[in-house]
Amino acid sequence: MEKFQSYLGLDRSQQHYFLYPLIFQEYIYVLAHDHGLNRSILLENAGYDNKSSLLIVKRLITRMYQQNHLILSVNDSKQTPFLGDNKNFYSQVMSEVSSIIMEIPFSLRLISSLERKGVVKFDNLRSIHSIFSFLEDNFSHLNYVLDILIPYPAHLEILVQALRYWIEDASSLHLLRFFLHEYHNRDSLITSNSKKASSSFSKRNHRLFFFLYTSHVCEYESGFIFLRNQSSHLRSTSSGALLERIYFYGKIEHLAEVFTRAFQANLWLFKDPFMHYVRYQGKSILASKGTFLLMNKWKYYFVNFWKSYFYLWSQPGRIYINQLSNHSLDFLGYRSSVRLKPSMVRSQMLENAFLIDNAIKKFDTIVPIMPLIGSLAKSKFCNALGHPIGKAIWADLSDSDIIDRFGRIYRNLSHYHSGSSKKKSLYRVKYILRLSCARTLARKHKSTVRAFLKRFGSELLEEFFTEEEQVFSLTFPRVSSISRRLSRRPIWYLDIICINDLANHE
C-alpha cells in the first residue's frame, strides 16, 4: 500500500482529498487490473479480464473528457450516448476503478492504525479467520449469547452519507450515487430479501459491492466499539479497523507470548473479556457472562442506537437471547456448546476417605456430519443417506487430476475443521471421498471398484489423504516434542479463504 500511495502521489495531509481526478488517469485502470496489488485490501478482480485493454481505457477516458456533465440523473442517462453501445461494460469498469479510489482512505487509515500500535499486518487476513480465534475463547464461564441479524439501511443514500466521514471528496460521492442509481436493484443491495437481485449486482460489481458492505459494517460495529471502550475490562482501541480485526490482532499478540513459553500455559487468548464477538454471513454473535436482564437491555439498546444514530432499520425480534448452557452455536459448519464434564475427586482426611463428584464446564466444537453429507450429496459425491457414488462429470479427466481434486477437497475440509475438539465426522467424510474417488476411477477404466483397487492397489489413494499429524511432523521435523503437544490441541490453518462450496475450482 505504501507503493500504491507514492505512485498516486498522495501524502498524509491530502490523502482524503481530490480522489475524483484519479478516475481520468490510465494507471489507475492498470492497477485495478493487477491481481497482485495488495490483496489484503483490494479484492481480486475477475470481472473484465478478457476484455480490458489500454485502447478501451483511452477510449473511455476520452469520452469522459468530452462529456460536459459526467454525473447525470437516471432519466437523463438513458437518453445520453455517453457510454455508447458498451454501456454495461464501461459502467462495470468505472465502478471497479471508482471503488478502488474510494478504498484509499479506508486502507490508509487501517495501515496507520497498525503502525501506531507496532502490529505486523497479516496480508492473508480475511473475515473468516476471525471465526477461528472466536472459537478459542474461554466460553465455559459465559452465560448468554446474542444471535444478531445485522440491520440494513432503509435507503442506499444512507450509505453515501456514512461515507462522508471517510471520503471528503464530494465528486467521488456523486460518482458513487451515479452507479447506485444506475442499477434497478438498488433497494436489495444489502438486504437479504431479494437474493436474486443482490447476486446479480455483486457478480457484476464485486469490488464495489464489498466496499459498500464493509463501510456498512463499520457503521454497524461502531456500537460494539462504544460498549467496548466503556468497559473497564478492556483497553480503549482505535476504530481504524473492523472490530473483528481488532480482536484478531489482539489475540495474535497474546498467542505469540504463549509460543515463547513452549505451550506451558493454557491457550486462553483473552483472559477475561467483556464480550466475545464474531461476524459471519450477515449475522453476528455476541457472548457475555452477564445476566438475562443485562442481555435484554443490550438488545433494546442496540435497536435504539442503530435507529437513532445510523438510521438502520431493525426490530427486537432480529436479536435472539439464548442461554449458552442449553443452546449450541451453529454457524459456518461448526457446532459449539458448553457441556458438563463429570469428574470424581478422592479426598483423604485422617482415616476417612471421601469421593466427591464434580462437574466441570467444557466448551466443545464438533463437526456436524449431517450438513457435510448434505453438501457432499449436493455436489454428487454421495446420495442423501451418505452412500458414496462416482463423480461422473470428472470421468473424462486424467487419473492424477481426479485423485488431486478429491484430495484437495478433503484437505480443505480437514484444514477448515482442524481446530475442532471432536473430529470423528471427518473420518466419515474421508471414507465417502475415497470411495467416490475409487468409483470415479473405476467408471473411467470401465471396471469395478474391487478390480480397480486390486489392480492398482489401495496405496494409490493414501498419499492424497495424508493425516494432519503427519503433515505437521513433515513440516516441522525438528520440533517433534512441540508437534506432539500440538496434536492434542486445536490447530487452525489460515490458508482457508472461503468454504462456500466443496470444489471451488469448478
Swiss-Prot record:
Pfam families for this protein: Intron_maturas2 (PF01348), MatK_N (PF01824)
InterPro entries named in the record: Domain_X (IPR024937), Maturase_MatK (IPR002866), Maturase_MatK_N (IPR024942)
Gene Ontology, cellular component aspect: chloroplast
Keywords per UniProt: Chloroplast, mRNA processing, Plastid, RNA-binding, tRNA processing
Predominant subcellular localization, coarse grouping: plastid
GO BP, sorted A to Z: mRNA processing; RNA splicing; tRNA processing
Membrane spanning residue stretches: none
Localization (cell): Plastid, Chloroplast
Any one GO MF annotation of this record: RNA binding
Function of the molecule: Usually encoded in the trnK tRNA gene intron. Probably assists in splicing its own and other chloroplast group II introns.
Family in the record: Belongs to the intron maturase 2 family. MatK subfamily.
Entry protein name: Maturase K
Species of origin: Atractylodes lancea (Atractylodes japonica)
